């Protein structure tokens, strides 16, 4: 499911990781033809996706990457 709001995607991603940290993973890919970045967080049961083509949103990739790095080093 695509989530339109960044804050909602960020919060749900964190909740998903805290619920099942061993199975949750984060990935992103750039679709050159469309000029969009797609962020995906999944635990194989729940899939969260956020896509954007705005440059301001590209900076958020670093924000969520930092979140997952911080969460994995907490344990």
From Swiss-Prot:
- Give GO BP annotations, semicolon-separated: negative regulation of translational elongation; SRP-dependent cotranslational protein targeting to membrane
Q: Which GO CC annotations does the UniProt entry carry? A: signal recognition particle, endoplasmic reticulum targeting
First and last residue of the signal peptide: none
Where is it located?
Cytoplasm
A Pfam entry, by short name: SRP9-21
Q: Which InterPro entries match?
A: Signal_recog_particle_SRP9/14, SRP9, SRP9-like, SRP9_dom
Q: List the disulfide bonds.
A: none
A molecular-function term among this protein's GO annotations: 7S RNA binding
Alphabetic keyword roster: Cytoplasm, Ribonucleoprotein, RNA-binding, Signal recognition particle
The protein's matches in SUPFAM superfamilies, at most eight in alphabetical order, are given as:
Signal recognition particle alu RNA binding heterodimer, SRP9/14
Query: What family name appears in the similarity comment?
Result: Belongs to the SRP9 family.
| Summary of subunit composition and partner proteins | Heterodimer with srp14; binds RNA as heterodimer. Component of a signal recognition particle complex that consists of a 7SL RNA molecule and six protein subunits: srp72, srp68, srp54, srp19, srp14 and srp9.
Q: In UniProt terms, what function does this protein have?
A: Component of the signal recognition particle (SRP) complex, a ribonucleoprotein complex that mediates the cotranslational targeting of secretory and membrane proteins to the endoplasmic reticulum (ER). Srp9 together with srp14 and the Alu portion of the SRP RNA, constitutes the elongation arrest domain of SRP. The complex of srp9 and srp14 is required for SRP RNA binding.
Q: What name goes with this protein?
A: Signal recognition particle 9 kDa protein
The primary gene name is srp9
């Amino acid at each position: 499911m695509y989530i339109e709001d960044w804050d909602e995607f960020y919060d749900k991603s964190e909740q998903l990781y805290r619920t099942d940290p061993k199975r949750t993973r984060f990935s992103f890919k750039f679709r050159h033809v469309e000029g969009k970045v797609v962020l995906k967080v999944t635990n194989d049961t729940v899939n969260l996706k956020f896509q954007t083509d705005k440059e301001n949103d590209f900076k958020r990739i670093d924000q969520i990457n930092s979140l997952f790095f911080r969460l994995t080093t907490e344990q």
